[in-house]
């Protein structure tokens, strides 16, 4: 596994904002030529065309992270959002360095849950039901921050994707009676509904209310 502290960004964008598109493309091509096979450039499907054209690999975030970890590249440059580069770093070899060109590139859905909110929810569950580790399996969607993935690991939970979420819920319910799913309530509720759980039995925790 890579070290999440290995994710870097050293780009000063002000230096490039004034460049004409043609100049920017020339700079990119020159950098690619210098780095050669030492770097692999990953572009998520959502990237704009003038970035996408330079990609070595394209696809969804998990696919790209897996492919990058299998490469011999020293530098993994992920043109995507923050959690994508974190996943690439988690899956990377120890000697690989994951680089996110813009550390401000975020995902509004991933930001719907953060560690402080999840830990607060866990404490409230403890106040209401006793030991949450005995009753709840925490499940996070892969589109989430690395610290939420770590929280799930520390509490006997798991990470899911959109395609395996129903199977992950089956796994979770086989171990404990209840599931705490985040950050995407809609994926969690859809997966639960697919398992036959009535919607009125799936509670949405509200961080703005006492005891959610």
Predicted regions and their residues:
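Active-site loop-to-helix "anion-binding N-cap" substructures in soluble metabolic enzymes
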Residues: 2-212
